[in-house]
Amino acid sequence: MWLRRKQIVRKLTLGVVTTMLGMSLSFSALSATPVETHGQLSIENGRLVDEQGKRVQLRGISSNGLQWVGDYVNKDSMKWLRDDWGINVFRVAMYTAENGYIANPSLANKVKEAVAAAQGLGVYIIIDWHTLSDNDPNTYKAQAKIFFAEMAGLYGNSPNVIYEIANEPNGSVTWNGQIRPYALEVTDTIRSKDPDNLIIVGSGTWSQDIHDAADNQLPDPNTLYALHFYAGTHGQFLRDRIDYAQSRGAAIFVSEWGTSDASGNGGPFLPESQTWIDFLNNRGISWVNWSLSDKSETSAALVAGASKSGGWTEQNLSTSGKFVREQIRAGAGLSGGDTPTMPTEPTNPGNGTTGDIVLQYRNVDNNPSDDAIRMAFNIKNTGSTPIKLSDLQVRYYFHDDGKPGANLFVDWANVGPNNIVTSTGTPAASTDKANRYVLVTFASGAGSLQPGAETGEVQVRIHAGDWSNVNETNDYSYGPNVTSYTNWDKITVHDKGTLVWGTEP
């Protein structure tokens, strides 16, 4: 059950967004911006939700250091990123050291320019206090408190502002020793002026030690913990840390990642990057790529000399930039991206009547003998008339191996987990691969599926009634190698009781 705190609902004065001819754009003068759609963000049960209590995932890009390539941070470039790339969040990286804010406090004016642009464009913005070579955030704690007091005073009523108060603590700095005490003080400073905008806090070892933060979380309810990775350097061990942190109820935000190795060069490591992006998207974890710049490094999104104001063609994008743009566009549902929901035809279409419904499936968990069945599906309306979602029934067939009962969970749903209802049933004729099914239905609040539209991902997790391990290899609906969305006829869909997709066992 989703229990929402009372929230201060605040509005931005948003400019009218104009369309650009010849482009496939995410917004027009008739459609809502990300902030209009989601409003005030908060944390509930370790997940990022909008003001309606629906889970939301932010995807975007970060500037590089303002002292070096700050000219790329302006309203025109951010508008292009919103309209052509589909970003819903932008991160403005203000270094503290390395000729950053400490030596040049006027860089705060570029931060304010970026926030004003984000307010006008209706996108979320992360104000990043970019500690790095200074190792310990306490080195400039006094300056951080002054800076964030000003930012919170200016933007405490703007629901699109997010504060990142310690980019990458490193060296001998630990969560309990230095970072958490620092974060407590800076959070208090922010909360004295802004009661509820999100705060992101880094962890030790360049924001990799989120397991330490998860074990001793901050008391502020709207705090997320940053994890940073570079695909050529960091792999499964960090993904395992994310799973651990989430199991402890910690909210995770990947506020910086790159397609390169940790130096910013090498690669790009695109297969490794795709593994990471699939992992984050599967768990609904927000992410921001490094970086919007034309610097001579692999992780830069632009080639040397690219325009400072957007309008970039493919020739203006680096290999990394092309990949990241595709990933963001896919998440925003724009054409031309490498969309994870692009179907492949089933090898055995089956005998069910497809009608105007297509169901796509992917296996979320590659271990068929752990303690859970984890599956995800997406429904498409390929017809010409709207389909009322509450009329649909999705059935996932399995064999319970003699274990009674079931514990069912909705881990993710684009339509909102509160709009998904789960139960179990028994097929008319049991087989050695199917003596039960999980029934997934939609509440009336899910609305209708318009022609050409999709429900987006629904993730369901099924445990045996006694929480023992399961054996999925003999389950009718299980696809062991289906790790990306595929049209799947072994899960059925009924519309008002009539089979419209799939083949029953």
Swiss-Prot record:
- The protein's enzyme class: hydrolase
Q: Which reaction does it catalyse?
A: Endohydrolysis of (1->4)-beta-D-glucosidic linkages in cellulose, lichenin and cereal beta-D-glucans
Which residues are named in the active-site annotation?
Answer: E168 (proton donor), E256 (nucleophile)
Q: What is its EC number?
A: 3.2.1.4
Q: Taking the first listed entry, what is the main subcellular location of this protein, grouped into a coarse class?
A: secreted
Query: Which InterPro entries does UniProt cross-reference here?
Result: CBM2/CBM3_carb-bd_dom_sf, CBM3, CBM3_sf, Glyco_hydro_5, Glyco_hydro_5_CS, Glycoside_hydrolase_SF
What residues does substrate bind to? W68, V69, Y95, H130, Y230, A262, S263, W290, K295, S296, E297
Region spans: Disordered: 333-354
State its location(s).
Secreted
Question: Annotated region Linker: where?
Answer: 335-352
The entry's family comment says: Belongs to the glycosyl hydrolase 5 (cellulase A) family.
UniProt-listed PANTHER family: ENDO-BETA-1,4-GLUCANASE A, GLYCOSIDE HYDROLASE FAMILY 5 DOMAIN-CONTAINING PROTEIN
Q: List the protein's name.
A: Endoglucanase 6
Which organism's genome codes for this protein? Answer: Pectobacterium parmentieri
* Gene encoding the protein: celV1
